[in-house]
């Protein structure tokens, strides 16, 4: 049960952060921010939801990192990707296949980038401590990492 709760907390926070983030980034999706009440409330809650999502994902990281270490079988799996695409058996991949392991590590990397860039652009708390060029770079990094 704790694994499922952790998973759903992460998933719920992801949806809230993604929906509000789309509303911030694309004016035509501004209506999506209503999921958090008002656009003003979405601006306040978005960073807190992001921090909760990061903390929840870090718990999952420590639970699953050892299952996601890349090994020789994963290289064999990657080299035989054509067989996998046409649904042929390649062999046992263990708990997770190479593709799933890549998604796991990409999620870790991008969540760290989202956290760091999010802290830099978080107004009114941390943004005043950074220069405008650093904030602009952090905004670009945050947008790229969210995709």
Model-derived features with residue positions:
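Membrane-embedded alpha-helical bundles that constitute the cytochrome b-like, heme-associated redox core
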Residues: 1-147
């Amino acid at each position: 049960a704790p694994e499922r709760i952790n998973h759903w907390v992460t998933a719920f926070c992801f949806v809230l952060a993604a929906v509000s983030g789309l509303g911030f980034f694309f004016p035509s999706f501004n209506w999506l921010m209503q999921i958090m009440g008002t656009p003003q409330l979405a601006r306040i809650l978005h960073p807190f939801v992001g921090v909760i999502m990061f903390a929840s994902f870090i718990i999952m990281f420590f639970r699953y990192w050892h299952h996601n270490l890349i090994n020789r079988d994963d290289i064999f799996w990657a080299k035989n990707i054509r067989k996998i695409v046409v649904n042929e058996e390649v062999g046992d991949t263990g708990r997770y296949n190479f593709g799933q392991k890549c998604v796991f590590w990409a999620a870790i990397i991008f969540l760290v980038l989202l956290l760091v860039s999010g802290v830099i652009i978080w107004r009114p708390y941390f943004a005043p401590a950074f220069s405008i060029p650093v904030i602009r770079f952090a905004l670009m990094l945050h947008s790229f990492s969210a995709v």
